[in-house]
Amino acid sequence: MGDVEKGKKVFVQKCAQCHTVENGGKHKVGPNLWGLFGRKTGQAEGFSYTDANKSKGIVWGEDTLMEYLENPKKYIPGTKMIFAGIKKKGERADLIAYLKSATS
C-alpha cells in the first residue's frame, strides 16, 4: 500500500485538526478514528453523525477509504465532513497506510 511515515505527515497536515486516532481519543469536529478498519460508516460511539453517514452502510477498508478520501462529499452526499479530498492517489495510499497502523 503506502508509506506510513509519509501518511502520518498527511494526517497531521490535513486531518488532525478534526480527527484523533488513538484508542480512547476524543471526538473533535470529526470522530475519533480508532477502530476505523472493519467498522461501518457512522458507527463511532458517541459521535453525532448525519443520516447520510449512518445510512451509507459500507465498511471502511483500503478500497472504500481510497474512494472516500478522493472526494468525501461525492462518496457520501450529505456528510458533514467539510474536507475537499485528496486528489493524489499516492498521498491517499500513504494516509491509508498510516491510518491502518495508527487506529488498531
From Swiss-Prot:
Gene3D superfamilies in the record: Cytochrome c-like domain
Keywords: Acetylation, Electron transport, Heme, Iron, Metal-binding, Mitochondrion, Respiratory chain, Transport
Protein's UniProt keywords contain Electron transport: yes
Description of post-translational modifications: Binds 1 heme c group covalently per subunit.
Residues binding heme c, per UniProt: C15, C18, H19, M81
Positions bearing N-acetylglycine: G2
Chief place of localization: mitochondrion
PROSITE patterns linked: CYTC
InterPro entries, per database record: Cyt_c-like_dom, Cyt_c-like_dom_sf, Cyt_c_1A/1B
GO biological process, any: mitochondrial electron transport, ubiquinol to cytochrome c
Function: Electron carrier protein. The oxidized form of the cytochrome c heme group can accept an electron from the heme group of the cytochrome c1 subunit of cytochrome reductase. Cytochrome c then transfers this electron to the cytochrome oxidase complex, the final protein carrier in the mitochondrial electron-transport chain.
Protein family: Belongs to the cytochrome c family.
Protein name: Cytochrome c
Annotated organism of origin: Danio rerio
Gene name, Swiss-Prot/TrEMBL: cyc
